Amino acid sequence: FMTQDALPADKSLIENLVKALTEDEKTGAAYARQLPNENCRIVERYTRSFNYPDESRKKGKADIEEMGIKTFFCSDVCAAYRVDLFHKLGGFESPVIFNEDMFFAAKAVFAGYYVKYEAEAKVIHSHNYTVRQQFHRNFDLAVSQTMHPEIFEQISSEAEGMKLVKSTMKYLCSIGKPYLIFELGIQCVGKYAGYRLGKRYKKLSRKQILKCTMSPEYWKRLWNQEVSDGN
């Protein structure tokens, strides 16, 4: 799987993803390293390096205590899946508002398989989201987590978020650009506001949800299905 806004960084992308899957038959999914576009802003550029380091790692159930929510991280911006396992575990959930790749990765991990971050498989992919876009995106992210308490109830993503913020602040100071901490702070406000509202989406009206989401069509389909089911 690869999204239309991602570009292979070299000719070895598919080879490296396939290698990651075939090295160990217990590896159910492998995802690529994401490198920033040339026009990527400094804060987002660092976020890419934080989430997609230059060292590969295989993640399994035994890593949950150490890695927390990142154990289940997998991005189908560019990823490969073992076909037999993909079908055995039911593939991607549908309909889904967000995180379909992460949900599958969690199913694979809990089933005793591994998810491989393959740093040698590289794509160019980044966004310069506005604060409003960050708000909408994190609203949907939190909704998806709330809909899956079996995965996220015992593992908080907020701790990982704070780790990223602190690391980014330290980085900005180290490169002589502490003034960008203000930009980082504004982005964090947008992200956190969207996230907290998403966690409480069941208390919001439909009108409020449509103002917060970046996926209005998902909600319309969901609500229509509820009517059809008589709920």
Describe the function of each predicted region:
Residues 115, 121-194:
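Active-site-adjacent helix/loop segment of glycosyltransferases
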Residues 97-104:
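Acidic donor-binding loop at a coil-to-helix junction in glycosyltransferase catalytic cores
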Residues 1-7:
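Short beta-strand-to-loop acidic/aromatic patch adjacent to the donor-nucleotide binding site
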Residues 61-81, 97:
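A recurrent flexible, glycine/aromatic-enriched loop bordering the glycosyltransferase active site
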Residues 108-109:
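Hydrophobic residues within well-ordered alpha-helices
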Residues 7, 11-44:
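Conserved donor NDP-sugar-binding/catalytic core segment of glycosyltransferases
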Residues 194-231:
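Juxtamembrane C-terminal module of membrane proteins
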Residues 84-88, 122:
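Short, well-ordered alpha-helical scaffold segment located
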